[in-house]
From Swiss-Prot:
Single GO biological process annotation from the record: isoleucine biosynthetic process
Active site: 473 (proton acceptor)
Protein name: Dihydroxy-acid dehydratase
GO molecular function, a single term: dihydroxy-acid dehydratase activity
Taxonomic source organism: Chlorobium phaeovibrioides (strain DSM 265 / 1930) (Prosthecochloris vibrioformis (strain DSM 265))
Encoding gene per record: ilvD
TM spans (from-to): none
Amino acid sequence: MRSDTIKTGFEKAPHRSLLKATGTIKEKGDYRKPFIGICNSFNELIPGHAHLQELGRIAKEEVRKAGGVPFEFNTIGVCDGIAMGHIGMRYSLASRELIADSVETVAEAHRLDGLVCIPNCDKITPGMMMAALRINIPVIFVSGGPMKAGCTPSGKTVDLISVFEAVGQHSTGEISEQELESIEENACPGCGSCSGMFTANSMNCLSEALGFALPGNGTILAVDPRRNELVREASRQIITLVKNNVRPRDILSREALLNAFALDFAMGGSTNTILHTLAIANEAELDFDFSELNALSARTPYICKVSPATMAVHIEDVDRAGGISAILHELSKVEGLLDLSVPTVTGHTLGENIADAEVKDRSVIRSVEDPYSATGGLCVLYGNLAPQGSVIKTGAVSAPMMKHTGPAKVYDCQDDAIKGIMEGEVKSGDVVVIRYEGPKGGPGMPEMLSPTSVIMGRGLGDSVALITDGRFSGGSRGACIGHISPEAAEKGPIAALQNGDTITIDIPGRTISVDLTDEDIASRIAALPDFQPKIKKGYLARYSQMVTSASTGAILKTPVSCEPK
């Protein structure tokens, strides 16, 4: 066992003395058992994590019963909703790297034999996955579970996005202050990751397809008693994984990644999943290119439409309809789309995991013969505005905006854009451009939920597009194109845009372009001053210098001698 490094032999007496002082070692026989890290992310700032202390307790209890010695430790976490619309959002994506590094540090420093990872919200799940693949010891994921959707006294179903959009509605006088307060009070009824197919729930659903989590991980509600049972089962299973030395890189393959992307496209997951899955592939040293995604999306039917694409369906409804296993089982009917032979943490193949799954509600999960669209709910757009690509959640775009041409309304930061939209600067037909908000420029590639919500709230969702080198919340809807690469801070074409330039978006054609020649763009770029970092000290200053393009997952640069082969 790896942990023998810190517990076996007379020379390890000091180590054992310290371990005994923790109170976790109950008897000398514990030194012969595997040491299992309970990698929790409990904190009281994130509703998706406020209940995780109890899940950690359950995990420790089950690991000990199953023959291991549990050691709980915590990672940090950021609530994207609370961090939205101010300096805090610049820390959100950047926190993913801190989480990965911190999990690596604890597991390696203490020679743990395996990990039970308990994430939930946006950057915690991918951060833990990146660490798991980096250290490559047996790991199982069990999330905290989704939040239940809210309901106003009038019977209207609401969620967090309802609150953001209500701000825009209130600013135009469409709803009263009392109506806004009612939505605010009822949208988030308790613990769990926000209730739609936003980033957190998207990633926890993908965990099942990647093979890192047990069936039910993505959809069983945080308040459902089955969530606690799932934690118990996962905590027992880690002992089996350790005994059999089943490690993350034994599970994650190129085929498993393609399975996860197919699921993502079929349920219209968050655009952030592309960013995170590319980063996860990098940690596994798997060769996967951004440009491959459109071919897969073209073969994947969009069969499960969930908030924000529709307010009629939330994650609890997906669970009731059969969960992720049912979606995957339905997708398996498309010849060659899924590789069902890939291994998973259950000890069975993906195909075996989903063999008995069935769709219980066709209004939630459609058949592959009757999809919402024949192609997936996410895609990549290329063109002279995004030579390295950009992403859009097509499943949340209304029909009138699938093709759009309009004049650019350019803002060099999100705050100016929000102010301009609220003050009526943006008119029907415009294309709002928010730049210098990419991984380097932001820094941290902040989400644009506030401006997209204000656009929707002001009734412009069917007539205004928004493009950015930043990114979008999983809760954003409308013609929102993010991750434009190269970013403005790297003198990408988006930096050349001026007010009034004609931008054309063709989602079916997978293109985004500006009516300028290559020479026009080059001359404008040449006249620009070099980008000056907005933050000069602390973590974000270092992050800005080290982060790479969104098209590669916004991973950090490493020394050439340390780069994956």
